Amino acid sequence: MKSQFYFLQIDLYFHDYKFALLCLVTAFIVTLLTIPPIISLIKRYGVLDMPNARKEHSSPIPTMGGIAIIAGMMTALFLWFPFNSQLTQVCFFFSITVLFAVGIMDDLKDLSARYKFIIQIGLAFLIALSDLRITSFNGLFGIDELPLAAQYTFTILAIVGITNAFNLIDGIDGLAGGLGFMSLITLGIFLTMSGDVNTALIAFALAGSILAFLYFNFNPAKIFMGDTGSLVLGFVIAVLCIRLMQVNGSAINPVLPHAPVFVLGIVLIPVFDTLRVFAVRIWKGRSPFLADKTHIHHLLTNTGFSHSFASKLICFIHGFILIEVYWLRTLKQGLILGILVAFMLLVIVLLKNLYRFVRKNKSFSEENGIIYS
């Protein structure tokens, strides 16, 4: 009897994840096959990301790798996703199409930040209008159901904020893709466990595309995803996070009773880093949108570590956070939030002190004729 029940469980798991696996593999193959010709085409037309003082690469690199990422994702969804005429689906895929077009134009002509920001707000409002909103904090700060105006406000802030956070974290080889892949797999698994198998397919399809892209993007990068990819990546992750909160908030026995802080853990590194950098710039009397080299990855690369090491270390920290935020699920949400913020502050303090230590020892070594490597 136990054996029969065990095999029944396996069959149920396979039923839930077989289309997820098909989406992931299809997107992976399409993206893997699409990137080489895109690299050749981009080189031919000179659509290259040129090095400058605030960028980490030292030679021109083809950009717009997002074309292959979106091509892989949409091919997989076209084959395996149950499309219908529901307003939420229509608004979601329309928004992706618009952001994809904006990303292409930005990579080609460098659009103004204000123009992109206005479009993002409009698309976020459209998603909220389609009934995909942050409706409850699930008891976080003692808040449960939100008033309608607050639902729209927090939804728009979350989508625009997360979209831009992933766009800004895309500063060194493999970082945005690595963080995005781990976040998408996590979202896909927990959406499936929460009963929303169809929405999970979107996460797995984009994860497959990102995994193939990383093969060409890890140091030394052969192509960048550009705004064509990073804007869509951040937007999709934001929408899926809201959906995960929504399905757990309405469940009688939710898989994630602490869904609000869990989804915060999924996007913690890019969001925390963006808020920290903006706060420091404002504190110093500078525009928060004025680019510099103070992001979390710069704390490592400025110290002398390679892109590869910096990306892998930050992704390792991200993985630890994902495990930590799930492991702490039995605690009160406010306490979990405090632990997450304290952990990120500790990481930043350690990285800043590492930078000072290495620079100090480098100066000492150079003064005494010791080679630093």
Feature-to-residue mapping (PLM):
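Juxtamembrane helix-capping/reentrant segments at transmembrane boundaries
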Residues: 50-62
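Membrane-embedded alpha-helical core segments of multi-pass
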Residues: 97-98, 102, 119, 123-134, ...
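Hydrophobic alpha-helical hairpins/lids featuring a short glycine-rich hinge
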Residues: 91-120
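Membrane-interfacial loop-to-helix junctions in multi-pass transporters
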Residues: 145-157, 200, 258
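Transmembrane alpha-helix boundary signature
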Residues: 75-87, 105-111, 129-141, 247-248
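Alpha-helical transmembrane segments
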Residues: 2-41, 46, 70-86, 90-97, ...
